[in-house]
UniProtKB/Swiss-Prot annotation:
It catalyses: L-methionyl-tRNA(fMet) + (6R)-10-formyltetrahydrofolate = N-formyl-L-methionyl-tRNA(fMet) + (6S)-5,6,7,8-tetrahydrofolate + H(+). (6S)-5,6,7,8-tetrahydrofolate binds at S108, L109, L110, P111. The keyword DNA repair does not apply. The keyword Oxidoreductase does not apply. GO terms for cellular component: cytosol. It is an enzyme of class 2 (transferase). Keywords: Protein biosynthesis, Transferase. Attaches a formyl group to the free amino group of methionyl-tRNA(fMet). The formyl group appears to play a dual role in the initiator identity of N-formylmethionyl-tRNA by promoting its recognition by IF2 and preventing the misappropriation of this tRNA by the elongation apparatus. This is Methionyl-tRNA formyltransferase. Its EC number is 2.1.2.9.
């Protein structure tokens, strides 16, 4: 079975490896190299690096809408195109080019959290479970019928990065199961997504990571977890902007204004919120590295009342 794989970030690498392990991946599509790092040099995507290591031809078109891009894809004579966090829109002509169409590995239990950031939005919303769907792609945004799915619980203190890694591995397994069925001549039964329960996981940006202490502590704690390791929650603490890498909500009654430092110890720095308090455990000063609350207090000798 001739497979064309399309993906870009780390999340897609496990699925590429699963596809290449037992099947013929004739080409990999990934986004063009982007400037990255302090030197802003052009950097290949994680998927490109893995494909090169496997000797798989790599294509990096700016768009798939051109006649030339479609002709190139058709010339590969794919039986199936597997798409995992690719980042480019697939027009109808591309969706129809492979014999079996295009499959997508999506990191949510569709129709909940269609869109670009399902992992982070699930944590931010306080979901207790999520999962991975293998979907037959169609023109709509993550609207296609589901072929296979797997469900997992979200840990109480699980971060976006930790859940990302678990779902990347789970997605690779679900894809492997689907490819195994197709190779055996068994096409997975496509289940249309229900009309109820549709939500959208809008793309993350740094502005969303700025915390407002007037919000409930529980919501802020979820955002700290969701936005770790990117874009990383940030807030004003004791007069300086810091990034928050670890925090928990406290069910603590108080009469203080949001943003007031309530207490501090080796266990964390407690900050008044609109409801409850947020205990900051790991944080990062501008230009520094992530440190514990205890190390932060040692560095902030100007806060004797909190020591």
């Amino acid at each position: 079975m001739r497979i064309v794989f399309a993906g870009t970030p780390d999340f897609a690498v496990a699925s590429l490896r699963a596809a290449a392990q037992r099947h013929e991946v004739v080409a990999v599509y990934t986004q063009p190299d982007r400037p990255a790092g302090r030197g802003r040099g052009l950097t290949p995507s994680p998927v490109k690096l893995d494909a090169i290591a496997r000797g798989i031809p790599v294509f990096q078109p700016q768009t798939l809408r051109s006649p030339e891009a479609l002709a190139t894809l058709r010339a590969l004579q794919p039986d199936l195109m597997v798409v995992v966090a690719y980042g480019l829109i697939l027009p109808k002509a591309v969706l129809a080019a492979p014999t079996h169409g295009c499959w997508n590995v999506h990191a949510s239990l569709l129709p909940r959290w269609r869109g670009a950031a399902p992992i982070q939005r699930a944590i931010e919303a306080g979901d207790t479970e999520t999962g991975v769907c293998l979907m037959q792609m169609e023109a709509g945004l993550d609207t296609g019928p589901v072929l296979l799915s797997q469900r997992v619980e979200i840990g109480e203190q699980e971060t976006g990065g930790q859940l990302h890694d678990r779902l990347a591995a789970l997605g690779a397994q679900v894809l492997s199961d689907g490819l195994g069925l197709l190779r055996a001549g068994i096409r997975p039964v496509a289940q249309p997504q229900p009309a109820e329960g549709v939500t959208y996981a809008h793309k993350l940006d740094k502005a969303q990571a700025r915390l407002d202490w007037a919000q409930p502590a529980e919501e802020l704690a979820r955002r700290v977890r969701a936005f770790n390791p990117w874009p990383v929650a940030e807030a004003i603490l004791a007069g300086e902007r810091v990034r928050l890498h670890g925090a928990v909500a406290l069910d603590l009654a108080h009469q203080q204004a949001p943003g007031t430092l309530l207490a501090a110890s080796k266990q964390g720095i407690d900050i008044a919120c609109g409801q409850g308090a947020l205990r900051v455990r790991v944080l990062q000063r501008e230009g520094g590295k992530a440190i514990t609350a205890a190390d932060y207090l040692n560095a902030r000798r100007d806060l004797p009342a909190l020591r």
